[in-house]
Amino acid sequence: MITIKDLGFAYGEKAVLKNITMTLEEGRIYGLLGENGVGKTTLLTLLCGLKKPQAGTIDTDGMKPYDRQPSLLSNQYYLSDEVPAMNMKAAEYAKNYGKFWEGFDMDKFLEVMGVLENDPQQKMNQMSFGQLKKTYIAFALACNTKYLFMDEPTNGLDIPSKAQFRKAVTKYTREDSVILISTHQVRDLENIIDPIIILDRQDVLLNASLEEISEKLYFDYSADRIEGALYSEMIPGGNIQVCLNQNGEDSKVSIEALFNTVHQHKELIKGIFNK
């Protein structure tokens, strides 16, 4: 489990994160959403120890990530949005670098590469960006870490590859893992991320499971307009509208509509979910 308390970080005089408090529990795939520049990547790098908190604390199973303790380093993996094109075959990379993670499984790496339809014998510096990204995704999953942080993992992937990514993440991660995926392409991950974290500048607007969200908000997909809806958008065949769930009705959460609703009603949403 990761416990974040009053976390703060700034670049010079520009505060990016301020008083961030939340808990990330085991067995969850968290979606980290937010507009560009709100601190999603900064938060990921703080969680994996690449940056040191300037205020507050991060506790990962009783350890501080920035202390870079080997027992924690070998049990976490950070997949950056920018991945290096090494001058070696993908299989060689996995063999050479996998030894730094005690749970690394070469057979799993090759299996995930197969699921992603990627050639492990191809040199990484001859791959397209999408192929390179899939190589690092396969490596990340093969490390079998408890903590996995991914920054925009579907960037550069075509539509079939995005479906393969969803399949791989749901099939090849540990049951006790804590996975945090930063994305601005919510439709790519809509069926696998739960809970949802929405960051704003220096603040957390929402940190809730889909069950909690559907208990408090109702997502309507009919052609009829609803008076007083918090958010409304025309879609083929009608509208998608978000309202307060005053009647306890079940509905399917649209993460994209949720994101827009939260940004249009920041204080209202914080008040609803912080009760």
Segments from the language model and where they lie:
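ABC-family P-loop ATPase nucleotide-binding domains
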Residues: 77-135
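Helix-to-loop junction immediately C-terminal to a conserved catalytic motif
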Residues: 48
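Catalytic Walker B motif of ABC-type/P-loop ATPase nucleotide-binding domains
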Residues: 148-152
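Conserved ABC transporter NBD signature motif
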Residues: 56-67, 71-72
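ABC transporter nucleotide-binding domain
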Residues: 165-180, 184-243
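The feature captures the beta-strand-to-loop junction immediately N-terminal to the Walker
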Residues: 33-35
